[in-house]
Amino acid sequence: MKDIQSTPAQIAFPIDRVGVKGLKFPIQIQTRDIGMQHTVAIVDMGVDLSVSSRGTHMSRFVEVLQDWNEPLCCESLERLVKQTQKKLQSQHAYIAFFFPYFLHKRAPSTNMLSLFSYDCKLSAKSINYNIEFILELTVPVMTVCPCSKAISHEGAHSQRSEIYIQLRLEQFRFIEDFIVLAESSASSPLYSLLKRADEKYVTEDAFAHPKFVEDVVRNISSKLITVTDVLGFRVEVESFESIHAHNAFAYIEHEFIC
């Protein structure tokens, strides 16, 4: 059969990235405490395309992914990227896994156990077989306004906030290490299951540790800069203000060039 994709491009523009998006794929990922966690990822895959080809071979992306049967980490992702480059005969390749990562969390007072999910993304891109890894995660937390607490006779405004972390990694690190690092930098973590005694504890503990978004982003950055295998990072904290119709945010970037 005639292979139309392999004919020369009619317009002489090379394509930076072409491929498939939104592939659902079951994965395993190593946890610190409970071994392998099974979850479902959304996978994006892409390669560059020269002017010598009108189109890429879309089915080959799916073939490569179907043949890949390893727990997700930087080392296995590197092998997948290189195999994609080889199969698609490309100079550059990009693969990203978007997935929910689950932790068992105990309520602070009753010790009741429940699952809590975090949105994560592990991606890799290659340029002439040099590989760069990026781990991204979103950690929801609670923040209490220090100013509101200082000027009010009773209470202070509090709200749910989100911490967005992007990390340039030299090698894979346990995701929960970064989750704990982020949660400990805010006024309080969040929980799926809280009884009344737990609600009392969380409220009082959060009000004992008021934080601006500026405090949270600085706390996290000061910890990340000491972590081995983290080559650079971006951290943004966004607070969904309970007394305003707008949000507050703070952002720090350190040696994050990609």
From Swiss-Prot:
Q: Name one GO biological process term.
A: tetrahydrofolate biosynthetic process
E.C. no: 3.5.4.16
InterPro entries, per this entry? GTP_cyclohydrolase_FolE2, GTP_cyclohydrolase_FolE2/MptA
Keyword Membrane found:
no
The alphabetical list of record keywords is: Hydrolase
User: Which pathway, metabolic or otherwise, does it act in?
Assistant: Cofactor biosynthesis; 7,8-dihydroneopterin triphosphate biosynthesis; 7,8-dihydroneopterin triphosphate from GTP: step 1/1
Q: Name one GO molecular function term.
A: GTP cyclohydrolase I activity
List all membrane-crossing ranges.
Answer: none
Q: Which Pfam families match?
A: GCHY-1 (PF02649)
Function, in words? Converts GTP to 7,8-dihydroneopterin triphosphate.
Its recorded name reads: GTP cyclohydrolase FolE2
Q: Which organism is it from?
A: Lawsonia intracellularis (strain PHE/MN1-00)
Q: Which gene encodes it?
A: folE2
